[in-house]
């Protein structure tokens, strides 16, 4: 072995031996002076305390603090001077390990380099008056010059906490922070310029992080694990926590913070960021009052969240909360439905207007560039804004372009069923939020629908190639550019509703929709479904009513005022031209006003009403008929239910006034025997053609007269209609065949009883008489037949002599 190696080994051996001798001496010294050392340590630790620190016993543990001297203090308690009043011990530790500087110890002084607290409870208490048991620690008087004769306070370089319960209980500020610290290790560096820098490694269970105990705790029962770098500046009193990754539960967070201890109530700002957290996991970290609201929603994929908490440790309410969330291509579940392909940037604050405090009333949510798809309908909202979470109000601009058939996914097919066509929507809205759903939205903007096929299911009415433009203003609704096509019918419409949205939500019965309707051609048979019974009934509106139910109720209860102009109207055999009408549609029926049409060379005007009762429709009509071709008139209305007298038997021009009521079926047919009322008529240039009841009698009585073409110069009369029976008021018939006085009852079943007084003289003999009085006097000259038309045994009308006539007439 080389000589230098031997020398080196000897030196090392001497040093080791010297160290062992020193430690043996120290051990002997500590054991010999245990009580005095315990007293010295206690005095040192009590030096700057407003209270008492007591130590039960002390045991040396040299190897743990090598090369320093370690001492284990058992049953350590620390109580402030007012402990008897509040009964909250600041520190109660079963074991406290202290490592002291060896050289200082040999000099007779104590310099603490490390302290460890095991199996302990730390309770920082502040009562309702603001007094805290941390008052045990005396504040340094910065104005007082340091006395060289005074020894400095002990500096702690390292510390550890194991199995420590740490509580901050602030009764005045309604705050409760409670942690079960499994393991905490820290290294502290004290720069020459003052302050300190610390590196910490933490593993703790958060039992409570309640900034307002009346609201509940954040991150309750969550495990926190991770490192911290903390610095403190003596001059500013600011504690700075550098951003580091801290695991809260199973989610990593980047957390940084700042605490300003120079203020009477320490102010704090905590910055939190997580790049990949599920919505429900994030909501579970918040206070229960916030969690309950957020859990009404859900996002399927993780999101990126930034959060800043700010406040102070003094009395007061909640901390300020500012949250920013980034959502992309996610699935959003809401109480109102599911939004697919959802992307947006969201912001939340509980102090929206500066100076108005922190509260739900001053809270706001903003959603920027919101895009998604609801029930396969894509839409976007540039900026959605919700403020005042106590009575939340949502505003925004809703935009969407979609195939209109997709509306069936939202409103169902019970009322409106959509086929092809497109919709373009741009609406600014303002709505209350009740139970996390938009309620009573007020909208402003446009809805355009083009080339759409729509079926109105309750009435079985179908429209093709429909167009409509809805313009919502602040108060009113304007409906423009409407094109409806049902079969051969094409209708162009424009409408308006005053005070629409207000009445829609509060009193739909008062809604009055004004329509201007124009059409080149309408086939009424294609709209016959409006006479039928509606399949679904309108339900009483509730908070849970869906859009379809509310719209259905609107259609049922609102009033519609129509001004109609139609070039041609077809119904079965009926054709009218130049039609004009004013209709008022209400929940109870239809009021018909100022109706005028051209028909069969003349005109028809009418007023009346239609009331629906189940599967039938009761109508009342007052009509004025002027110069209408009676043949076409009877043909158009299927001879008004008569089988004996038809359009083939009639000729002439009809002038008439009627006051009639009746019943139409849901198929649009006049129900037999349902007509009641009166008909006054004047038939000019009339003729009765091949009318069998006349021919059957006339071929025997008047074999040489023309029975196939019986002409009338003027025929006036009045009929009273009572269902199956028509009362023929006494009337005179002056024809080319014969003259006749007629009166009685014509029945469409049984009960016909018509008296006929027929002079047999040929009316042509009086054709050249111009004097009306003379013609009237000669009218009944000669032989007069008194006949009675009544029911025969075979059910047909039979003509016989009227032997029981009133002979005084």
Question: Regions from the language model: what does each represent?
Answer:
Residues 128-135:
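A short alpha->loop->secondary-structure connector
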Residues 712-719:
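Generic long, charged, amphipathic alpha-helical segments
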Residues 2-18:
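N-terminal Sec-pathway targeting helices
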Residues 20-127, 193-195, 214-218, 225-226, ...:
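Terminal hydrophobic membrane-targeting helix
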Residues 55-57, 73, 93, 112, ...:
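Hydrophobic residues on conserved beta-strands that form the core of alpha/beta folds
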Residues 75-78, 242-248, 367-374, 481-484, ...:
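Short beta-strand segments that buttress and anchor functional surface loops
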Residues 721-727, 732-736, 749:
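Extended serine/threonine-enriched, polar tracts that run as long, contiguous segments within proteins
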Residues 44, 51, 64-66, 105, ...:
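Membrane-proximal interfacial segments on either side of biological membranes
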């Amino acid at each position: 072995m080389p000589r230098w190696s031997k020398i080196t080994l000897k030196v090392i051996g001497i040093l080791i031996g010297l160290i062992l001798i020193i430690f043996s001496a120290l051990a002997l010294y500590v054991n010999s002076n245990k009580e005095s050392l315990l007293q010295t340590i206690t005095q040192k630790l009590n030096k700057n305390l407003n209270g008492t620190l007591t130590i039960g016993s002390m045991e040396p543990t040299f190897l743990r603090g090598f090369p320093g001297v370690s001492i284990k203090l058992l049953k350590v308690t620390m109580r402030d001077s007012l402990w008897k009043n509040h009964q909250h011990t600041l520190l109660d530790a079963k074991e406290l390990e202290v490592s002291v500087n060896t050289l200082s110890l040999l000099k007779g002084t104590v310099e603490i380099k490390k302290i460890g607290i095991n199996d302990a409870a730390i309770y920082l208490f502040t009562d309702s008056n603001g007094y805290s048991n941390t008052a045990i620690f005396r504040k340094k008087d910065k104005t007082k010059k340091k006395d060289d004769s005074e020894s400095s306070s002990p500096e702690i370089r390292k510390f550890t906490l194991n199995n420590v319960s740490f509580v901050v209980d602030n009764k005045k500020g309604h705050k409760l922070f409670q942690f079960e610290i499994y393991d905490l290790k820290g290294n502290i560096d004290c720069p020459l310029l003052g302050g300190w820098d610390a590196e910490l490694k933490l593993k703790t269970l958060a039992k409570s992080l309640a900034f307002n105990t009346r609201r509940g705790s954040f991150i309750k029962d969550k495990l926190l694990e991770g490192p911290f770098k903390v610095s403190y500046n003596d001059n500013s009193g600011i504690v700075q926590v550098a951003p580091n990754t801290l695991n809260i539960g199973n989610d990593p967070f980047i957390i940084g913070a700042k605490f300003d201890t120079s203020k009477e109530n320490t102010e704090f700002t905590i910055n939190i960021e997580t790049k990949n957290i599920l919505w429900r996991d994030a909501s579970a970290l918040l206070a229960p009052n916030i969690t309950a609201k957020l859990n009404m929603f859900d996002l399927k994929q993780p999101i990126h969240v930034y959060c800043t908490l700010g406040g102070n440790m003094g009395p007061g309410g909640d901390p300020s909360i500012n949250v920013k969330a980034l959502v992309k291509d996610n699935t959003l579940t809401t109480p109102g439905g599911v939004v697919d392909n959802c992307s947006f940037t969201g912001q939340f604050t509980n102090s929206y207007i500066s100076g108005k405090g922190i509260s739900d009333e001053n809270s706001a949510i903003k959603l920027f560039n919101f895009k998604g798809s609801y029930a396969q309908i894509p839409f976007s909202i540039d900026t959605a804004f919700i403020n005042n979470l106590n009575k939340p109000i949502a505003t925004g601009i809703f935009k969407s372009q979609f195939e209109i058939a997709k509306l069936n996914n939202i409103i169902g097919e019970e009322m409106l069923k959509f086929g092809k066509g497109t919709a373009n929507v741009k609406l600014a809205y303002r709505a209350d939020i009740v139970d996390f759903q938009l309620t009573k939205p007020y909208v402003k903007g446009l809805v355009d629908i083009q080339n759409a096929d729509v079926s109105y299911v309750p009435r079985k009415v179908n429209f093709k190639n429909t167009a409509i433009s809805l313009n919502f203003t602040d108060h009113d609704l304007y409906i423009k550019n409407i094109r409806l096509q049902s079969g051969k019918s094409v209708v162009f419409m424009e409408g308006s509703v005053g005070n629409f949205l207000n009445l829609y939500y509060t009193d739909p019965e008062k809604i009055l929709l004004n329509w201007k309707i124009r059409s080149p051609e309408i086939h009424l048979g294609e709209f016959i479904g409006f006479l039928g019974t509606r399949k679904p009934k309108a339900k009483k509106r509730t908070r849970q009513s869906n859009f379809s139910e509310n719209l259905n109720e609107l259609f049922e209860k609102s009033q519609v005022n129509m001004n109609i102009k139609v070039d041609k109207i077809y119904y079965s055999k009926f054709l009218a031209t130049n039609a004009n009408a004013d209709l008022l549609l209400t929940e109870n029926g239809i009021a018909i006003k100022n109706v005028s049409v051209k028909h069969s060379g003349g005109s028809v005007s009418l007023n009346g009403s239609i009331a629906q009762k189940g599967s039938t429709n009761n109508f009342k009509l007052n009509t004025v008929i002027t110069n209408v071709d009676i043949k076409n008139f009877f043909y158009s209305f299927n001879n008004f239910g008569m089988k004996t007298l038809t359009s083939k038997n009639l000729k002439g021009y009809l002038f008439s006034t009627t006051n009639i009521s009746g019943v139409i079926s849901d198929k649009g047919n006049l129900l037999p025997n349902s007509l009641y009322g009166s008909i006054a008529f004047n038939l000019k240039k009339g003729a009765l053609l091949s009318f069998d009841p006349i021919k059957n009698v006339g071929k025997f009585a008047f074999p040489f007269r023309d029975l196939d073409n019986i002409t009338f110069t003027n025929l006036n009369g009045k009929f009273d209609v009572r269902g199956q029976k028509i009362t023929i008021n006494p009337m005179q018939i002056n024809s080319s065949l014969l003259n006749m006085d007629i009166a009685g009852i014509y029945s469409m079943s049984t009960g016909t009883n018509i008296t006929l007084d027929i002079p047999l003289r040929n009316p042509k003999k009086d054709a050249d008489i111009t004097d009306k009085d003379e013609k009237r006097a000669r009218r009944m000259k000669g032989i007069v037949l008194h006949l009675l038309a009544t029911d025969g045994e075979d059910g047909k009308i039979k003509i016989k002599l009227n032997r029981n006539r009133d002979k005084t007439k």
